[in-house]
Structures are given as structure tokens and as C-alpha cells.
Amino acid sequence: MSQSNTQEGDLLLTTGEDLSTYADVLVAPYNSSGLLVVTRPAANNDYALYVLVYGAVPGGQATVRPMSPNRTVRITAKGAGNPGDLLVLADGVTTAADRGKVRSVAGLTSGSGTYRLVGVAEELFVDGQLVRTRPTFGSVTV
């Protein structure tokens, strides 16, 4: 087995947008001329695999934490929810300020589209709270 040149724990990744005023939101990996960069998710079904720990200016090095089911993370919530609620990316397409936040599937209306499932809430939460989340991955269509 060859597992050289791998990394564990927090990573320093180049930003593809100004993330200097953000933390505790999800960011997704993208290709920029052959370079891995992270930005807040551009679509509701993007693969937002990292929690932003410390943001940075465009082209700077942001500290991100890869999500793993082995470790809970805290992510900024959009709206309220309950323990056990499935969490998906908030609708950052309609409201840019919500990019990278999570919301409960229970709050989605029928026919609203496909969303990236990112975790399960492990506590009661309200809008703007850093909700304790157990990461999981998938898609939810409503």
C-alpha cells in the first residue's frame, strides 16, 4: 500500500474568493487553472467538504478542516432545527449571504430542488448558531 504525500488534520488551502471575514461555514474545492482553491459553495448541491476555520483574502491561505464522520464540527445554521435533523447546504444561490451555512431538511418546501446532505444535527439550534454536526454525505431531493 502506498500512502505517501497525504495529509491529516487542518489544511492550508488557497482561497478563490475573499474569505477573510468568514469562519465556521462550509467551503468547497474547485479547480482554478490546475490549482486547488476553496470558496463558499456556488450551488446547493456542491461538494462542501471542509469547514472554514480561518479565512483569508483571495489567493491567500485559509485554514480548513476536512469533514469526517469520526469527528463532530460546528457550522453556522440558517434557520432553526432539532437534534437528529438532516442538514443540507443553505440556499446560497438565492441569498448569497447564506453560502456555506447549513439548514434543516425539515424546512425545505416540496419541489425546491436537490441539496447536498452534509450532516446530522446533534443538538437543538436556532438561526445563526454554531450547530454541532455529525458529518455525513449524500444528496436530498425535495
Residues covered by each model-derived region:
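Glycine-anchored, exposed beta-strand/edge motif detector
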Residues: 1-142
